[in-house]
């Protein structure tokens, strides 16, 4: 194997694994606190999401309450209007979280975010909520993305 090719592969891998966490804002987390948000692959911010590809979203958070269930609700906010952004699995207990959720324990909510080919190529703010038994937000975060061809 050519050493230049190996070097490019290693640098690409390092860029992929050493990407900065996604910058986000809290949008009303009632029952929890988000520590970090990661999207893979995402080498720059806002993340460029390519149509027809899937991305892994990992939200590290802690809960302030006990909850037997958790449900994700995702919207793309366009001109201040939330538009539903369907995800394949909205059950947080099937997305890296071992339920029941208990207070003060760290959790990693991990799921796939598919970007459909029919989505328009635009900049959008993603609003991601994970709700508890009482439909209160364990977390609510917003972060910008750009959907590209």
Curated annotation (Swiss-Prot):
SMART domains: ML. Disulfide bonds join 27-140, 42-47, 93-99. Glycans are attached at residue 58. Its main location: secreted. Intracellular cholesterol transporter which acts in concert with NPC1 and plays an important role in the egress of cholesterol from the lysosomal compartment. Unesterified cholesterol that has been released from LDLs in the lumen of the late endosomes/lysosomes is transferred by NPC2 to the cholesterol-binding pocket in the N-terminal domain of NPC1. May bind and mobilize cholesterol that is associated with membranes. NPC2 binds cholesterol with a 1:1 stoichiometry. Can bind a variety of sterols, including lathosterol, desmosterol and the plant sterols stigmasterol and beta-sitosterol. Belongs to the NPC2 family. Binds cholesterol in a hydrophobic pocket; there are no hydrogen bonds between the sterol and the protein. This is NPC intracellular cholesterol transporter 2. The gene is npc2.
